[in-house]
């Protein structure tokens, strides 16, 4: 188990140390490579937050926590957010390995972000609480493997990943992320 974890960390470090090389490839779902939020329709017993029709193709955010409610409110208020959706029943997942086993990571939100460039920035967002080893593997895979692979593919626009550790400060974190890409 420890050997598998060490090998996974070494692999992510090697890939991260060779930026710009198009070695990573995206694994697409053959029958639905692009995905779509317009067909999302499900019942829930969870609390919900209504979304603005001009911001989200899904009418409500099904809430898993107060943190996600606060984050949805923040997204609704930001002009730079052109569209967003909570990744609930969308099927958007990032494959990763933890303790030697293949797993699927379902990030919390997907955002189309206007960073001042002609093409919108697609932002994968994780709302995180306390640090956990499995979460570290998910975040590492998303930032060091998945984002570089999808950006190298070139057909799906620009992508980035951000982890929100304090939803009450999410606007600042998103502004910092936006600033990074305005200068890139």
What are the roles of these predicted feature ranges?
Residues 1-106, 112-121, 127-184:
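Intrinsically disordered, low-complexity, repeat-rich regions
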């Amino acid at each position: 188990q420890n050997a598998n974890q060490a090998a996974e960390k070494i692999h992510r470090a090697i890939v991260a140390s060779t930026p710009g090389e198009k070695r990573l490839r995206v694994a697409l779902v053959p029958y639905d490579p692009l995905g779509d939020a317009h067909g999302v329709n499900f019942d829930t017993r969870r609390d919900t937050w209504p979304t603005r029709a001009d911001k989200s193709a899904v009418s409500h955010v099904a809430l898993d926590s107060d943190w996600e409610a606060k984050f949805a409110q923040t997204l609704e208020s930001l002009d730079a957010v052109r569209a967003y959706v909570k990744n609930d029943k969308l099927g958007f997942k990032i494959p990763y390995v933890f303790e030697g086993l293949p797993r699927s990571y379902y990030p919390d939100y997907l955002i189309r972000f206007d960073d001042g460039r002609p093409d919108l920035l697609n932002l994968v967002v994780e709302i995180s609480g306390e640090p956990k080893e499995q979460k570290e593997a998910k975040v590492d895979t998303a930032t060091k493997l998945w984002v570089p692979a999808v950006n190298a593919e070139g057909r799906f626009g620009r992508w980035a990943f951000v982890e929100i550790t304090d939803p009450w400060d999410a606007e600042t974190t998103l502004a910092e992320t936006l600033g990074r890409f305005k200068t890139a």
